[in-house]
Amino acid sequence: CELSNITIVLEKEECGACVSVNATWCSGYCYTKDANLMYPQKSEKQGVCTYTEVIYETVKIPGCAENVNPFYTYPVAVDCHCGRCDSETTDCTVRALGPTYCSLSQD
């Protein structure tokens, strides 16, 4: 479980544009084990590679109307560890949209 470089796509529907930025996020493997069949009532905690600390960076999205805030702030991982996925701050699903997904049509 460690920091890795990634390109993510940021978008604001009101601006009609997507912007690619370089960031870091956590990826890799964490030690896991299956539940003991002799003691099924004891559940094992399965750790995921997640961030310990993040900072926030801001980028200006082009093409915004005057009445729209053109700035987009996004998290960048600074440190990683194996732990529980916090669904309050993290998308813990397997079927999330990819980091390069843009819902706006690109010419």
Swiss-Prot record:
Cellular component, GO, one term: extracellular space
Pfam families in UniProt: Cys_knot (PF00007)
Chain ranges passing through the membrane: none
Glycan-modified residues: N5, N22
Signal peptide: none
An example Gene Ontology molecular-function term: follicle-stimulating hormone activity
Cystine pairings recorded for this chain: C1-C49, C15-C64, C18-C102, C26-C80, C30-C82, C85-C92
Record's subcellular location: Secreted
Major localization listed first in the record, in broad terms: secreted
InterPro entries: Cystine-knot_cytokine, Glyco_hormone_CN, Gonadotropin_bsu, Gonadotropin_bsu_CS
GO biological process: one example: follicle-stimulating hormone signaling pathway
Record carries keyword Electron transport: no
Record keywords: Disulfide bond, Glycoprotein, Hormone, Secreted
Homology family: Belongs to the glycoprotein hormones subunit beta family.
PANTHER family in the record: FOLLITROPIN SUBUNIT BETA, GLYCOPROTEIN HORMONE BETA CHAIN
Function: Together with the alpha chain CGA constitutes follitropin, the follicle-stimulating hormone, and provides its biological specificity to the hormone heterodimer. Binds FSHR, a G protein-coupled receptor, on target cells to activate downstream signaling pathways. Follitropin is involved in follicle development and spermatogenesis in reproductive organs.
Assembly and interaction partners: Heterodimer. The active follitropin is a heterodimer composed of an alpha chain/CGA shared with other hormones and a unique beta chain/FSHB shown here.
Name of the protein in question: Follitropin subunit beta
